[in-house]
């Protein structure tokens, strides 16, 4: 039984301090939340960045400052910067973090409804993102909000338009307008990826804990964090990303699973070890 990889999505692009005052905006706040998640058991940090006033940005320099500050404190953590950004951003804006040559980055696998907005990921956009990641030696985390997104990216991999096996998928379930977060849907998604692939689930909102437990039982991995959910339980806001990660650790240990550290996560994900 492989160890469980926990990813912490520490701020996202949508959630605000008005919803939970612990949501990080500044560089110092991002480092604080990164450390809380790492110390609780997260091997991976999924990174969005904000301006100090909370405005989402895909600016290369802002990503560099934030990621450098985190790396100084957590030298072995895996960071996966977002290329999803926020709805309405151009593909050129969204690609900026790949200029930093991270180990991994997200690649969203199709257009979908996103609440009242459209998350636009056309085939030309996806090809451009795949080309950049191939050129820069970046392993994508393929974010799939709908079942068709899996088929789309598998077809692209066969054509060499995106990096192929071993592939890492993140199933984002529970976004309003996309695939509901049910155990049946999660199992179906997981059954559609190639042998040798790895996968993680992001359960959005109240679905976070059901999806976490189901993924652990199925042999998958788990993403939690303020981007996806700000509550530990009904009416109980988390005081940090670390509290959310710690809850996943408790669930995993009750189910007999050990937690992967960053070195073990790199091996599971077929990443190069740190030098």
Segments predicted by a language model, with ranges:
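Alpha-helix-loop-beta-strand connector modules within alpha/beta enzyme cores
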Residues: 2, 8, 55-81, 128-135, ...
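Glycine-rich, proline-tolerant flexible connector loops at the mouths of alpha/beta enzymes
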Residues: 18, 43-66, 114, 171-173, ...
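Active-site beta->alpha loop and helix N-cap motifs at the rims of alpha/beta catalytic domains
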Residues: 27, 57-121
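Conserved, mostly hydrophobic/aromatic
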Residues: 30, 37, 48, 105, ...
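Short beta-strand segments at enzyme active-site cores
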Residues: 42-52, 79-83, 143, 265
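Catalytic alpha/beta core domains of metabolic enzymes, predominantly
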Residues: 104-227, 238-239, 243
């Amino acid at each position: 039984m492989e160890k469980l990889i926990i990813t912490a999505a520490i701020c996202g692009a949508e959630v605000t301090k008005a919803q939970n005052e612990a949501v990080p905006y500044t560089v110092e706040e991002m480092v604080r939340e990164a450390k809380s998640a790492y110390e609780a058991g997260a091997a991976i940090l999924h990174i969005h960045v904000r301006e100090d006033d909370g405005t989402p940005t895909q600016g290369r320099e802002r990503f560099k400052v934030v990621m450098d500050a985190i790396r100084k404190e957590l030298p072995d953590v895996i960071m996966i910067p977002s290329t999803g950004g926020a709805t309405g951003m151009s593909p050129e804006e969204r690609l900026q973090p790949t200029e930093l040559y991270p180990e991994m980055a997200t690649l969203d696998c199709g257009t979908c409804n996103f609440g009242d907005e459209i998350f636009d990921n056309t085939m030309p956009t996806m090809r451009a993102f795949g080309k950049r990641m191939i050129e820069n030696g970046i392993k994508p985390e393929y974010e799939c909000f709908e079942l068709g997104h899996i088929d789309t990216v598998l077809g692209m991999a066969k054509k060499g338009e995106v990096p192929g096996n071993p592939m890492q998928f993140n199933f984002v379930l529970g976004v309003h307008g996309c695939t509901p977060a049910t155990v049946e849907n999660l199992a179906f998604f997981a059954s559609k990826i190639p042998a040798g692939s790895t996968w993680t689930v992001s359960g959005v909102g109240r679905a976070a804990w059901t999806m976490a437990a189901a993924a652990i039982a199925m042999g998958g991995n788990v993403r939690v964090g303020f981007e996806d959910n700000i509550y530990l339980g009904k009416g109980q806001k988390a005081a940090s990303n670390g509290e959310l990660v710690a809850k996943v650790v408790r669930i995993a240990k009750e189910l007999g699973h050990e937690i992967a550290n960053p070195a073990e996560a790199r091996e599971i994900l077929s990443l190069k070890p740190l030098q």
